[in-house]
């Protein structure tokens, strides 16, 4: 995980303009302000692994849905800075590229450098129908599951109904003298 994070950080640009025209400036001398915690990086890599399998199995819709679900969930948390969201994006991208053979680590002058392979992915293993179905099922389970914090509360539909009644309970408690 730390190795993928390090190489993904190397791919983060100092200046990035989103499709909506928003410019994100990244201070590369302060990585700690842009890199996400290890547990979040593990989640990004886990999702990226499924995106890579979808790409190898030629399931572009599932790959896109998997990635978009990750990014939307993280945006909805309003927890990450623009720089951290850019890092999450780059970590996902770098992981997918690594697993699909589009990135190689090449040793040059005693240091390892990332080399992006242009054109078709180097790994061209084809998926069986069984593997393709398994990848589809796993991605759809992720896409259709509740976001991680809500999923920890067990069943997604009942909890939203019960918290409003619980919110009404603290009022009498707060009226104590």
Where in the sequence are the language-model features?
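Compact alpha-helical subdomains of small soluble proteins
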Residues: 2-16, 26-29, 60-177
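N-terminal, post-cleavage mature segments of outer-membrane
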Residues: 19-22
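Mid-chain, structured segments of secreted extracytoplasmic proteins
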Residues: 29-72
């Amino acid at each position: 995980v730390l190795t993928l994070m390090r190489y993904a950080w190397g791919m983060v640009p100092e200046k990035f303009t989103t499709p909506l025209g928003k410019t994100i400036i990244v201070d590369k001398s302060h990585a700690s302000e842009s890199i996400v915690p290890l547990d979040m990086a593990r989640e990004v890599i886990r999702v990226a692994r499924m995106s890579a399998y979808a790409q190898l199995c030629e399931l572009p819709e599932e790959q896109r849905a998997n990635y978009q679900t990750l990014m939307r969930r993280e945006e909805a948390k309003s927890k990450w800075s623009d720089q951290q969201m850019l890092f999450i994006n780059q970590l996902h991208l770098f992981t997918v590229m690594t697993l699909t053979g589009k990135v190689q680590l090449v040793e040059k002058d005693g240091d390892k450098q990332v080399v992006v392979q242009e054109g078709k992915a180097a790994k061209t293993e084809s998926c069986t129908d069984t593997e393709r179905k398994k990848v589809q099922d796993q991605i759809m389970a992720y896409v259709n599951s509740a976001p991680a914090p809500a999923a920890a509360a067990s069943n997604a539909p009942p909890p939203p109904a019960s918290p409003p009644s619980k919110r009404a309970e603290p009022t009498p408690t707060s009226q104590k003298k």
